[in-house]
Amino acid sequence: MYALSEKGERIRAMFGSIAPRYDLLNRLLSLGIDRRWRRFAVKKIGLNGAGRVLDVATGTGDVALEIASQTPASVSIVGIDFTPEMIELGRVKVKDSRHSGRITLEVAPCEEIPFDDGSFDAATISFGIRNVVDRIKGLTEMHRVLKGGGKIVILEFSTPTLPVFKDLYHFYFLKVLPKIGGAFSRFSAYQYLPDSVLEFPSRDVFKGMMTQVGFKDVRHFDLTGGIATVYVGTK
């Protein structure tokens, strides 16, 4: 069983504490843009026939449900997250959806995915890779469980490239967002969000990490002026 580091345990506890308000806060803080980002990311999977998709850091299951809505009924989806509180809420959401028979959710960390080599046709992780303490280990695990030719799609916050937009973005993330989030939930959780985004590697460095673990044809797509980025690679 994979043992989380002290930092990993703190991150898990933090997300567990905000789980009941997680979806609402994300909608409010992003003005709903995160839904469009998720739809764009899922389209990059490009799975048109039968298959199996893994959604890592699934949270309360939003991406797993989006995958189900965009793929044929012959596609099954497994979502994993290291936060039990998120999985518990996600299971309720999935059960109440029209895709309940296609989605299963399990508690598991990205660094130790409990499936055999070559188990999935595609893997996704949205707004989760920056929370993985050992990112190389997490990327290696996702590469391991993919079949040959399988695709990985990663959606993550980034830093805008336009100078003026970047200044506004930093002001919002560093000054406004933590206060809004703190009004609804633990302040520390929404101070962690901007800190973790600003600490995340640059696009080129992160693509290099994906290549390092074996992914090929690694590309990225900037969304909404570079506020978010989708990374795509193939095993």
UniProtKB/Swiss-Prot annotation:
This is Ubiquinone/menaquinone biosynthesis C-methyltransferase UbiE. Gene3D superfamilies: Vaccinia Virus protein VP39. CDD domains: AdoMet_MTases. Pathway: Quinol/quinone metabolism; menaquinone biosynthesis; menaquinol from 1,4-dihydroxy-2-naphthoate: step 2/2; Cofactor biosynthesis; ubiquinone biosynthesis. It catalyses: a 2-demethylmenaquinol + S-adenosyl-L-methionine = a menaquinol + S-adenosyl-L-homocysteine + H(+); a 2-methoxy-6-(all-trans-polyprenyl)benzene-1,4-diol + S-adenosyl-L-methionine = a 5-methoxy-2-methyl-3-(all-trans-polyprenyl)benzene-1,4-diol + S-adenosyl-L-homocysteine + H(+). Its EC number is 2.1.1.163, 2.1.1.201. S-adenosyl-L-methionine binds at T60, D81, S126. It comes from the Bacteria. The keyword Ubl conjugation does not apply. GO terms for molecular function: 2-methoxy-6-polyprenyl-1,4-benzoquinol methyltransferase activity; demethylmenaquinone methyltransferase activity. Belongs to the class I-like SAM-binding methyltransferase superfamily. MenG/UbiE family. Pfam families: Ubie_methyltran. Methyltransferase required for the conversion of demethylmenaquinol (DMKH2) to menaquinol (MKH2) and the conversion of 2-polyprenyl-6-methoxy-1,4-benzoquinol (DDMQH2) to 2-polyprenyl-3-methyl-6-methoxy-1,4-benzoquinol (DMQH2). Transmembrane segments: none annotated. GO terms for biological process: menaquinone biosynthetic process; methylation. Keywords: Menaquinone biosynthesis, Methyltransferase, S-adenosyl-L-methionine, Transferase, Ubiquinone biosynthesis. It is an enzyme of class 2 (transferase).
